[in-house]
Amino acid sequence: MLDIQLLRKDLDGVAKRLADRGYTLDVAAFSALEAERRAIQTRTEELQARRNSLSKQIGAMKGKGEDTSAVMAEVGGIGDEMKASEAKLGEIQTRLSDLMLGMPNIAHESVPVGKDEADNVEVRRWGTPREFDFAVKDHVDVGTPLGLDFETGAKLAGARFTMLRGSIARLHRALAQFMIDTHTLQHGYTETYTPYIVNPEILYGTGQLPKFADDMFRVEKGGGENTITQYLISTSEISLTNTVRESIVEGSALPIKLTAHSPCFRSEAGSYGRDTRGMIRQHQFDKVEMVQVVAPDASYAALDEMVGHAEAILQKLGLPYRVVALCTGDMGFSAAKTFDLEVWLPAQNTYREISSCSNTEAFQARRMQARFRNAQGKPELVHTLNGSGLAVGRTLVAVLENYQNADGSVTVPEALRPYMGGMERIDAPAQVS
């Protein structure tokens, strides 16, 4: 959530910066609500002052034995008006809050201005795409003989679900273990196991609600007035970031660095017809997430560090990739600045997103009321960052495509062999005649 004081001081400036993000701020509606709020607050303060004055007058009159009934009646009338004003003020504050909850974060000044992914800016590349001396297959054709089973996944749960079997399932697990081990043993993160189902207020904290309810899978139990609504997490960023919700941490405890391997559940409501083949876009997929909670003056150094941590995974796996700075129109709702990592997929002859690392500054912290005690001992909002380290399914896709062999086998990257019992390659199971 944005700082409402920023809007009160520079409404037109905020509106312009939000327009760069593709969001049209209803300046007239905000101004009207603010004017009404100020008028009610001013009137309430006047009534409070008048009531205080009359209360003193009543005390003095009683001391003199004078009749106070008329003054008491006026005090009663003031009380009734104040109750009505408080109710109206509460209504206005709710409307302001609803308006604020729908506003995306303001982009950092270094973010390129643009409308969509076509305006993103490539920062750097690593690795050289492999040259194949045979016809390259995509991960579906490579993986299906090795244990990638889309047919059974669809039979069990519908489109965009996958079953993994045998060595492919083991490779998928090895990738997640390798990522977690790298982040905990080399990058200083604390491994965390989180709930996969969370309460609605948790999603308000990280910005998925109210705007993106259609992208979430909802879980309901009970019935009627006793219905309890919860949601499956779309990323463990949700659970990890909210660990500091409604708390004040000591400055000496920062940075807090957490990582988790979890399934993620997304309805992909706005993705109809996109990436329908294979594992690129699934309703259920695994991801290793990184989250950092830091002091404001350290957040952009932390963003660069986090990007480096995601890059390290790709480098250790020997997968070519590029780093892209997202433009204002392509960033996520809560982000102030985002870098995407895109891995090379030879069958598509292009780079595809495999990680997104974002600094949300105080946007999520303000929604969660997550603070730290600064050097002066005063509570101050933290900055929160999140990044994929990496999406496990898409990394599996990249390994299958980049490490495929002409005979249909897949070479196991050296970094994963300790997690695969020393296995150097995955061959299709022998066909039983």
UniProtKB/Swiss-Prot annotation:
Gene Ontology biological-process annotations: selenocysteine biosynthetic process; seryl-tRNA aminoacylation
GO molecular function, one term: ATP binding
Binding site for L-serine: T235, S236, E237, E289, S388
Subcellular location: Cytoplasm
PROSITE patterns associated with the record: AA_TRNA_LIGASE_II
Reaction it catalyzes: tRNA(Ser) + L-serine + ATP = L-seryl-tRNA(Ser) + AMP + diphosphate + H(+); tRNA(Sec) + L-serine + ATP = L-seryl-tRNA(Sec) + AMP + diphosphate + H(+)
Gene3D superfamilies in the cross-refs: Bira Bifunctional Protein, Domain 2, Serine-tRNA synthetase, tRNA binding domain
InterPro entries assigned: aa-tRNA-synt_IIb, aa-tRNA-synth_II, aa-tRNA-synth_II/BPL/LPL, Ser-tRNA-ligase_type_1, Ser-tRNA-synth_1_N, SerRS_1_N_sf, SerRS_core, tRNA-bd_arm
Top class in the EC scheme: ligase
Pathway(s) served: Aminoacyl-tRNA biosynthesis; selenocysteinyl-tRNA(Sec) biosynthesis; L-seryl-tRNA(Sec) from L-serine and tRNA(Sec): step 1/1
Domain of life: Bacteria
Pfam families found in the cross-reference section: Seryl_tRNA_N (PF02403), tRNA-synt_2b (PF00587)
Keyword Cytoplasm recorded: yes
EC number, UniProt record: 6.1.1.11
Keywords carried by this UniProt record: Aminoacyl-tRNA synthetase, ATP-binding, Cytoplasm, Ligase, Nucleotide-binding, Protein biosynthesis
Sites where the protein binds ATP: R266, S267, E268, E353, I354, S355, S356
Homology family: Belongs to the class-II aminoacyl-tRNA synthetase family. Type-1 seryl-tRNA synthetase subfamily.
SUBUNIT field: Homodimer. The tRNA molecule binds across the dimer.
Domain notes: Consists of two distinct domains, a catalytic core and a N-terminal extension that is involved in tRNA binding.
Function: Catalyzes the attachment of serine to tRNA(Ser). Is also able to aminoacylate tRNA(Sec) with serine, to form the misacylated tRNA L-seryl-tRNA(Sec), which will be further converted into selenocysteinyl-tRNA(Sec).
Protein name per the record: Serine--tRNA ligase
Taxonomic lineage of the native organism: Bacteria, Pseudomonadati, Pseudomonadota, Betaproteobacteria, Burkholderiales
